[in-house]
């Protein structure tokens, strides 16, 4: 499962890339989505790699984002009680584990919003014009996406 965070804004973005970001539901900066590892998603990520940060997410990071930033329709917080009452999962942690193992989808919890609005990163980004390999924040972070998600908790 991939965590994808939009890092750059809408100015001077080509129409095709803006459409791709719209299909990924990344309409605003600091928004995050979690995507399954499919060829379609990989292609959209590759196309918009100059405007997003992405990487493979682990269970702990996903649990933290779901519990702190997960919202239901009506802007109510996602809680363990809601997950237990309205889905087959016992808690947010078990739901996150099932998501990482591709045994579940975000839509398995009813009314859960698929976009997570993150806080701007504490101490700022390393640079939004350079890739992660060049010392910036754009592109593929691999397993190190958890550090970015922790900064934006």
Curated annotation (Swiss-Prot):
SUPFAM superfamilies: Ribosomal protein L30p/L7e (SSF55129). InterPro entries: Ribo_uL30_ferredoxin-like_sf (IPR036919), Ribosomal_uL30 (IPR039699), Ribosomal_uL30_arc (IPR005997), Ribosomal_uL30_euk_arc (IPR035808), Ribosomal_uL30_ferredoxin-like (IPR016082). GO terms for biological process: maturation of LSU-rRNA from tricistronic rRNA transcript (SSU-rRNA, 5.8S rRNA, LSU-rRNA); translation. GO terms for cellular component: cytosolic large ribosomal subunit. GO terms for molecular function: RNA binding; structural constituent of ribosome. Keywords: Ribonucleoprotein, Ribosomal protein. Belongs to the universal ribosomal protein uL30 family. HAMAP family: Ribosomal_uL30_A (MF_01371_A). Part of the 50S ribosomal subunit. This is Large ribosomal subunit protein uL30. It comes from Methanococcoides burtonii (strain DSM 6242 / NBRC 107633 / OCM 468 / ACE-M).
């Amino acid at each position: 499962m991939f965590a994808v965070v939009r890092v750059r804004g809408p100015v001077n973005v080509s129409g095709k890339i803006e459409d791709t970001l719209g299909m990924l539901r990344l309409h605003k900066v600091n928004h995050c989505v979690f995507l399954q590892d499919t060829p379609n998603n990989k292609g959209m990520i590759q196309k918009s790699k100059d405007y997003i940060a992405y990487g493979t997410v682990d269970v702990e990071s996903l649990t933290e984002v779901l519990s702190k930033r997960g919202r239901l329709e009506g802007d109510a917080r996602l809680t363990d009680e809601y997950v237990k009452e309205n889905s087959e999962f016992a808690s947010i942690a078990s739901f996150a584990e099932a998501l990482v193992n591709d045994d579940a989808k975000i839509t398995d919890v009813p009314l859960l919003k698929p976009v997570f609005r993150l806080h701007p990163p504490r101490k700022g980004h390393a640079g939004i014009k350079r890739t992660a390999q060049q010392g910036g924040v754009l592109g593929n972070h691999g397993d190190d996406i958890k550090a970015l998600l922790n900064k934006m908790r």
